[in-house]
UniProtKB/Swiss-Prot annotation:
An essential GTPase which binds GTP, GDP and possibly (p)ppGpp with moderate affinity, with high nucleotide exchange rates and a fairly low GTP hydrolysis rate. Plays a role in control of the cell cycle, stress response, ribosome biogenesis and in those bacteria that undergo differentiation, in morphogenesis control. Monomer. Residues 160-334 form the OBG-type G domain. The keyword Isomerase does not apply. The gene is obg. Its EC number is 3.6.5.-. This is GTPase Obg.
Length: 373
């Protein structure tokens, strides 16, 4: 199936039904009075996150989604039937934005999370609501309200703990296939990866994390060059970025330091927050470097790149160093997840809305004896 991570659709909620201006006409009831019922409400448009859906391809071709209108009210105090809601099922990780106002309507991050994105119109009032002591036979009634109509943009941002960065053919797909069950296409030409790939890395029982591989970046990606700029949004939810560098390029004229700096510059141009995410340096293809040259080549790269963060030396093809890297990544994610939960708990405790009310003092009766003793 083709991977589609963006779509634009129009959602139209149902209109409310009109109220009825009806009079009770019945034998032996000379002054029946008003009996017009209200109109039914219009159907709403609801978005639901579904973990069994992986792409927005259904919305690339179905551009308009309409809910049903409410029925009109009728006589004999009959209210109109409400319009049925429609449900749009989307992948977990989808954001929904109003294209006219720029408002973020919803961010679907959990399975079965539901959000109303277009509200149905309210039904009109029948004339039975307008009777009074001075107006026994009202002819007034109100029409139903129109439902909301919106043009929205759907964007899928995959949910992963770790994202892979690097130039084409740096070995990102080889790495993710080495440490997980993901099987992306691997070949010796650039842009083999055309869509994001997700893999689950297990480091022990109930100990795992999700890693995302996106198409390789090239210089100018933030301005539209290559493919990577289309998929950088998928790294925005990650907690850690692994910058994979090819230390042994086939073309000897290629400078790994210059390529690594180009990747960092593209991150900064695309999104400052993404640039500031924690980033580790992963030097790949060490099996292609003679053993007596490895230390010198690694030191020269780190010095030329001006890097002072964590560095890991691996060979994704042979698996050398991959296990230690995965354990380090899991420990980092687990530690930061615990810290985030603790911070959220502190924020919750500081919120006055959730503070426990102090117990009321126990009043003594006239005899001076505590009634609870």
């Amino acid at each position: 199936m083709k991977f589609i991570d963006e779509a634009r659709i129009e959602v139209i909620a149902g209109d409310g039904g009109d109220g009825s201006a009806s009079m009770r006409r019945e034998k032996f009831v000379p002054f029946g009075g008003p009996d017009g019922g209200d109109g039914g409400r219009g159907g709403s448009v609801i978005a639901v996150a579904d973990r069994n859906i992986n792409t927005l391809i259904d919305y690339r071709y179905a551009k308009k989604h309409l809910a049903r209108n409410g029925e009109n009210g009728r006589g004999a105090d009959c209210y109109g039937k409400g319009g049925d809601d429609i449900t749009l099922r989307m992948p977990v990780g989808t954001t929904i934005t109003d294209m006219e106002t720029g408002e973020l309507i919803a961010d679907l991050t959990e399975h079965n999370q539901s959000v109303q994105i277009a509200q149905g119109g309210a039904g009109g009032l029948g004339n039975l609501h307008f009777k009074s002591s001075t107006n026994r036979a009202p002819r007034q009634k109100t029409d139903g309200k129109p439902g909301e109509r919106r043009m929205v943009r759907l964007e899928l941002k995959v949910l992963a703990d770790v994202g892979l960065l690097g130039m084409p053919n740096a070995g990102k797909s080889t790495f993710i296939s080495s440490v997980s069950n993901a099987r992306p296409k691997i070949a010796d030409y650039p842009f083999t990866t055309l869509a994001p790939n997700l893999g689950v890395v297990r480091v022990g029982p109930s100990r795992s994390f999700v890693i995302a591989d996106i198409p390789g970046l090239i210089e100018g990606a933030a301005e539209g060059a290559g493919l990577g700029h289309q998929f950088l949004r998928h790294l925005q939810r990650t907690g850690l970025l692994l910058h994979i560098v090819d230390l042994a390029p086939f073309d000897e004229s290629v400078d790994p330091v210059a390529e690594a700096k180009a990747i960092v510059n593209e991150l900064r141009k695309y999104d400052e927050l993404l640039y500031e995410k924690p980033r580790w340096l992963v030097l790949n293809k060490l099996d292609m470097v003679p053993e007596d040259e490895r230390e010198a080549r690694v030191s020269a790269f780190i010095e030329g790149f001006g890097w002072d963060g964590p560095v890991f030396e691996i060979s994704a093809l042979t698996g050398q160093g991959c296990e230690n890297l995965c354990y380090a990544v899991f420990d980092y994610i687990a530690a930061h997840s615990d810290a985030q939960r603790a911070a959220e708990a502190e924020d919750l405790a500081a919120d006055v809305r959730f503070r426990a009310k102090p117990a009321d003092p126990v009043a003594a009766d006239d005899s001076g004896v505590d009634p609870q003793q």
